[in-house]
Amino acid sequence: VFGPKHTRNGAAVITGAGSGIGAAFAVELAARGNRVVCSDIDEAAAQRTVDVIAGRRGLAIATRCDVAQIDDVNTLAAQAQSWFDGPPTLVVNNAGVAVGGQNIGQIPLDDWHWTLGINLWGPIHGCHVFTPILREAGAPSGIINVASAASFGAAPKMAAYNVSKAATLSLSETLAAELSGTPIRVTVLCPTFVKTNIITSGRITAESTALADRLMRRTGLSPEKVVRMCLDTNDHGGLYCMPQLDARIGWAIKRFAPETYTRGVGIAARVGSAVTS
């Protein structure tokens, strides 16, 4: 059922499409011949993405959506189906925020709620609303959830972010199992560093922001490359997309030697703190 052109010439809905990975998804999907609904909590940012697409003769509309609010996601689905005159063929649950720099017990509970509201409840709401729509359509389609290598990385001082992405990974795996035997393919994207503004726009301490920025500049892939790899993975029915080698190595070690991996992460964090202090 699924060929290499699955992500082409369809109808795509993207959350967090105002910048970064979400904007890259929107532009790439439009280039592949899809009509694209670009949603973001910042509608002006989503419109800027639409303007880029329009400048390349693509078809897209912008709409505001706070993925932490189920009513907003229901409205997004209704708007998309009205514009498409039918169901979408691809849903990308991408909207996300970053929190980091403090240990468990120091992280403000408000930061926990904010992070989980967007990073976890966003994908939950997206899957809850759109999965029945795709099931009823019964046509080849896809759901992409944007997680992170943080979903299995267990890096210290990133607990809220790690937990939100680990849950998104589990959500995606469970959804893929439930949709086995249907024409709906699920892919979870787990990159390490991607060159976006998520670090500077999140709630991260100055020290951690500086470190993450250095790592991103040295090792980060462009969002465009990450998006192309992810869409190709979904084309071919792949569940996991880990664009970078370090993510794939970390994933393998975590699976086969989890306690050794976790101890190693702790040692590396202590050494890193000693070097930078």
Q: For the regions a protein language model found, what residue spans apply to each?
A:
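Residue(s) in the substrate-gating loop at a strand-loop-helix junction
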Residues: 148
